[in-house]
Amino acid sequence: MRNLMLLAALFSPLALAQAVIEVAPHGVMRLPTTASTLHIERLRIAEHGTLLIPANLTEMRVAELHLGRDARIAIAPAEQAFRLEVASGEIASGAQISARGARGTPQQPALPGRTLSIRLQAVVAESLLLDARGGNGAPGYAGLDGADGQAGGCTWGQASRGHDGQNGGDGQEGAAGAQVRLELPVDFPAQVLQVRLDGGAGGLAGQAGQGGRGGLSKGCLLYSTQGAGDGRPGQVGNAGAAGPSGSVDLLRF
């Protein structure tokens, strides 16, 4: 009965309250996508466990948080900012909150790290990594090889030259690191926090296409045709630029 009530709460479109969420050791759990705001009475992620936050969730309030060793809260990239408020809790060494951007594709540019606002109140932490780096740019496309030339013939004569290879495409630009606001008590030790807000790496340059081989020579009864030259290789594309780094605003209360 309790499990049924919990499932009903999780999938309610309203703000949720008094829900208990537990992620098993080495387990992965994805929150539902039906609500934009989630209130959790107790959230426990065991060692090496991962809780996935969907893109449509914009606010999560946790009354009691327990992050085990190397546990992770992974927040999907999105245009909307995400706010996390924790009233009390314990965070073990190696735990992290990840809000990295997405890698680019040939059709879509890389996505930046998600804008975050995090408030930790009565929280004891051994260490915490906040990773909100930008997504890496997609690599440039490889240029096509040139077609081979036609061999010489006794009927049509001279061999044809190989076709030139195409140039490689340019890599896409990496996305920016996130904009982060941290609200921490005055006695919270800043040295337990590690924040990574680097911009994403630029995409690799596309490789050049090779030139096609020239047509071969042909020996005929009355004469011989000469072979033709090879096509020229294309040019290697340019590597994409790295994305700009994000920034962090630390507020003590």
Predicted regions and their residues:
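Structural detector for internal amphipathic alpha-helices that build alpha-solenoid repeat scaffolds
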Residues: 58, 116-119
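N-terminal domain-start segments of secreted/luminal proteins
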Residues: 17-93
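Active-site scaffold segments
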Residues: 179-183
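Glycine-centered low-complexity coil/loop motifs and glycine-rich tracts
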Residues: 50-55, 72-81, 95-114, 128-178, ...
